[in-house]
């Protein structure tokens, strides 16, 4: 959402047609709800007057970034309270500082747990096909001196079976009114494996990612991406010639697999439909 807000600022500075630019930004990530929320804030700042006040747009984008910095810190503080001394946490995709306006969400919790002497080890799914875990999460935790190991996505079951994981923490792109979660492809599999091994599965969800207008996960649009993300690696064709590819970027984790939602408001527990309905959310003020 923050990146989209600054995208509107750049479009305004360049003299681009702003309604066209906003439509393009909105269509770029249909699964994530906070992108639309941020664009709505920018549209409200534009008003009906012409020419557009670029300084006003800059002010709104900067405010969004500052709000995110503060709320992610609150979210992280709530998340760390769930972790015991010597914990080992498994993470999927990337939810760190370079993905937010602050310290990050799930990865921010892991980093804070390390800083407070609680974390024993972080396990990072490589997160196929874009490898956000291997490329981004491992880099960010490495910069912070957090002990971490990258694993292939399919290794999580064996890791849990061996008793090497105490909690799973992930982020989210959208949470439906009933608590169903849209997140990076592979999240659903991870939640199922965690449930099979009795390991808590936590979703870090800023209020701007909670969408009470979407009744459940079946109503969430799942973005599908280019086949080459799967058929090619570092520019080299690695798939059989003519292989058919299905490449959804996200999946839906049913609410009953979520142990708790870590938010800036606190840790939310079931029943999710009732609990989520009572929140005062930034995207519905």
What are these regions (language model features)?
Residues 1-49:
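Long amphipathic alpha-helical segments
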Residues 25, 29, 60-70, 95-99, ...:
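Flexible, glycine/proline-enriched loop segments at strand-loop-helix junctions
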Residues 1-4, 34-35, 94-102, 247-262:
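Conserved phosphate/anionic-ligand binding catalytic regions in large, soluble enzymes, centered on
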Residues 3-7, 36-38, 90-94, 169-171, ...:
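Short beta-strand segments
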Residues 103-115, 191:
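Histidine-anchored nucleotide/phosphate-binding helix
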Residues 73-77, 105-109, 150-152, 183-186:
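Active-site glycine-rich loop that binds ribose-phosphate moieties when present
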Residues 34-90, 120, 124-168:
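Ligand-binding beta-strand-loop-alpha-helix segment within the catalytic cores
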Residues 119, 125-285:
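Conserved phosphate- and dinucleotide-binding cores of soluble alpha/beta proteins
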